[in-house]
Structure formats: C-alpha cells, structure tokens
Regions:
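Conserved acidic residues
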Residues: 62, 107, 134, 157, ...
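N-terminal nucleotide/polyanion-binding subdomain common to many enzyme families
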Residues: 1-87
C-alpha cells in the first residue's frame, strides 16, 4: 500500500484511515511481510523538538498516522488546507480486535504493568472471547534480551505496543528487524 504523506512539523504523516490499516494488515499477513505503524499527536510533536532519538525512531516506522483533532487543526493552520483526517486508535481498537478475531489472527500485547495488562486482557476476552491472544509482556520491567524471543515464540501475527511515547517508538525502531510478526503497531498507553 502506498499512502500519501505530508510533512508537518519535523516529521512526515501518512494520510491513512482505519480502512487503510485493516487493508494493510490483510496484505502483510497474507504476503507474510512485516509493517510497522505508529502515530503522531501534539504530545509527540512537542517531544520531537528536543528528542532526536524519537525523531529518528519515527523515521524508521513505515506508516505514521495523525492521532487526534489537534493534528487536523495544525494541518489546516500550517498547510492552509484540510490535509489530515485524524485516526484516533481508541475509537477503533475494539473494531480492529474483532477484525482480528474474525480472521483468526493472533495478537501479542506489550506494555503497561502486569496488573493493567491482566485487567485489559480480561476485559477484551469478555467482549471478544474468540480473539487469539498469544501472549503479553509488561512494558516497564520485563523488557530484556528474552523479550524478543518470547514474542517470536508466541507466533503472533500482530504486536500491539502500548508503552507511551517516546518509549514505544524507540523500542519498536530498535527491535523491528528481530521480530517475527507481520504487523507491529504503537497504540499508546494501555
């Protein structure tokens, strides 16, 4: 999939919608290829201005979508046109997980604390009982050399990384080449 991208602040943002993310997921899983997806919101824009490591990490992510209404306003003010439709992942996460369930894809959750992860997974299982959750890891004190091995052995198709910015983007950019998954997606704090 080729998506138009626009330069806004110190990074590029792809003009993608939820339907593009689902199409990209289907494509990469069917072709057994890998893709990374992240987002840019006003908080990340502020961080980029003083964090070159984050800027470099964002440049390594295949697709960055605009997150939140603030990015739409910024594009209108700075670029003088409605260039971006924001894709707020919290509006689509349940729909995406149901999409994964329907296709029998396996998902791995990386991020947050053990307590929050267990509560999140229990809630997801109560609403989407047939979703194949292939594993989870604490994103704060369980990240070590074995983490990649655990994720890879889970046979997950999709990895959701919810560690907040800039940690999740930097972790993804440093580890994407070692991951045996099809879709790696930064989803914010869990």
């Amino acid at each position: 999939m080729i998506a138009e991208k626009i330069k806004l602040f110190d990074t590029y943002i792809h003009k993608i919608k939820f339907e593009d993310v689902t199409a990209l997921t289907i494509e990469k899983i069917n072709k057994r290829e890998k893709v990374s997806i992240g987002y840019v919101n006003p908080h990340i824009v502020r961080l980029i201005s003083s964090d070159r490591k984050l800027e470099s990490a964002l440049n390594k992510i295949d697709y960055l979508h605009a997150d939140g209404f603030g990015m739409k306003v910024a594009s209108k003010l700075l670029l003088k046109k409605d260039s971006i439709e924001p894709l707020n992942w919290t509006d689509h996460c349940i729909e995406y997980l149901r999409f994964c369930e329907k296709n029998n894809w396996r998902i791995f959750f990386l991020g947050s604390t053990d307590n929050i992860l267990h509560k999140t997974i229990d809630s997801i299982k109560s609403h989407i009982p047939k979703l194949q959750i292939s594993g989870h890891l604490n994103g704060f004190n369980q990240l070590n050399e074995e983490s990649i091995d655990i994720i890879n052995k889970s046979n997950a198709n999709i990895l959701w990384i919810g560690m907040g910015s800039p940690k999740q983007e930097i972790w993804l950019s440093e580890n994407i080449d070692e991951l045996n998954i099809n879709v790696a997606q930064c989803v914010g704090d869990v």
